[in-house]
């Protein structure tokens, strides 16, 4: 079907597994292509709540999922896998969309919640992982890459027009700033933002994280040095969690030489 064709167009992003979630009565369907890094055998997506009312998919990685899982288990929550995506599901069940603030990672997340008749789309704080939305006149579409929209018959027939405003921005700035894309009707979900849809119609957008809102600390240079090294050590440690072999690109610049 169309959803499987959309998912197959992203097989290069997730060559290891495919999952489909379909709620025909509500007109919701989600496809996922998975690159297996955490819990190879038990991380199939979408993750679905025990009552079948909530489904979660993500592209990315939640670096603090081990700590969050331990906290949830201490509160009596049953977690059946080692997957960071299941941790998102269990947190959402308890805290709703506010759970995003608990996540330390790079991610693009879709959460279908039949209880609210709502679909949430969310991106990480600075937008490491991409997420695009498109309204083709009949439905709302979302994907990690724009080309995943092309298998949809209505999109293929209409051949989305070039967005002249986006071209103006490109000629002015030498790039197209978000939320614009080169195509009319195709937009980025902004970093640090979630969007809520009901029956394909947007009903809310909220910035859940903003750098300008972060509190300034009145630290001395020595305090900042200690804080920086502690943060760097912790950031490196939690990014080394994987159930597959991993490597590192060391370019010789300031960042890789520091690590």
Residue ranges and their predicted role:
Residues 1-259:
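Cysteine-centered catalytic environments shared across enzyme families
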């Amino acid at each position: 079907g169309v959803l499987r064709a959309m998912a197959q167009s992203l097989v290069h992003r997730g060559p290891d597994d495919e999952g489909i979630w379909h709620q025909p009565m509500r007109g919701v369907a989600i496809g996922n292509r998975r690159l297996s890094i955490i819990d190879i055998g038990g991380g199939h997506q979408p993750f679905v709540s025990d009552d079948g009312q909530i489904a979660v998919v993500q592209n990315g990685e939640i670096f603090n999922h081990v700590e969050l899982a331990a906290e949830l288990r201490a509160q009596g929550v049953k977690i059946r896998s080692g997957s960071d995506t299941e941790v998102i599901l269990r947190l959402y069940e308890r805290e709703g969309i506010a759970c995003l603030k608990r996540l330390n990672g790079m991610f693009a997340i879709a959460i279908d919640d039949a209880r609210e008749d709502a679909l949430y789309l969310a991106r990480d704080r600075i937008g490491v992982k991409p997420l695009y939305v498109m309204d083709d006149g009949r439905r709302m579409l979302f994907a990690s890459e724009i080309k995943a929209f092309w298998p949809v018959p209505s999109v293929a027939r209409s051949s989305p027009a070039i967005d002249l405003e986006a071209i103006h921005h490109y000629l002015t700035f030498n790039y197209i700033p978000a939320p614009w894309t080169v195509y009319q009707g195709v937009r980025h979900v902004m970093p640090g933002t979630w969007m809520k849809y009901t029956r394909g119609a947007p009903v809310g957008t909220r910035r859940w994280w903003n750098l300008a809102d972060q509190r300034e600390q009145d630290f001395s240079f020595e305090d900042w040095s200690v804080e920086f090294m502690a943060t760097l050590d912790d950031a490196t440690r939690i990014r080394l969690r994987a159930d597959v072999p991993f490597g590192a690109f060391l370019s010789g610049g300031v960042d890789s030489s520091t690590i």
